[in-house]
């Protein structure tokens, strides 16, 4: 079954937890993975190196637009990276995902 993986970077674990909890509570994601990363990027003409937390949201195709909008509205970054990837899950996981998101 088709599903969507959507990820964003957060400034810290607290923000990642807040976004994860909010998405779960709103029924927009069935599961969120969080992991610390080191990010290197250019911002406003300067090179930046920051510790961040990647939050990977697992959701349905039907909920993806709403999740993306919700993340954009609730993210603390001025320009958050909210990246959507189409994916395919094994049948039992896809059934669980659908059940959770329909509840």
Segments and roles (model prediction):
Residues 1-103:
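Positively charged, small/polar-rich N-terminal and surface patches that mediate targeting and assembly
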């Amino acid at each position: 079954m088709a599903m969507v993986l959507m990820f964003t970077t957060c400034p810290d674990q607290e923000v990642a937890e807040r976004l994860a909890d909010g998405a779960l509570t709103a029924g927009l994601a069935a599961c969120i993975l969080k992991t610390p990363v080191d990010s290197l990027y250019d911002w406003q003409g300067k090179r930046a190196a920051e510790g961040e937390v990647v939050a990977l949201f697992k959701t349905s195709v039907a909920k993806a637009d709403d999740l993306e909008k919700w993340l954009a509205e609730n993210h603390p970054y001025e320009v958050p990276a909210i990246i959507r990837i189409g994916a395919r899950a094994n049948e039992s996981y896809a059934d669980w995902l659908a059940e959770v998101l329909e509840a």
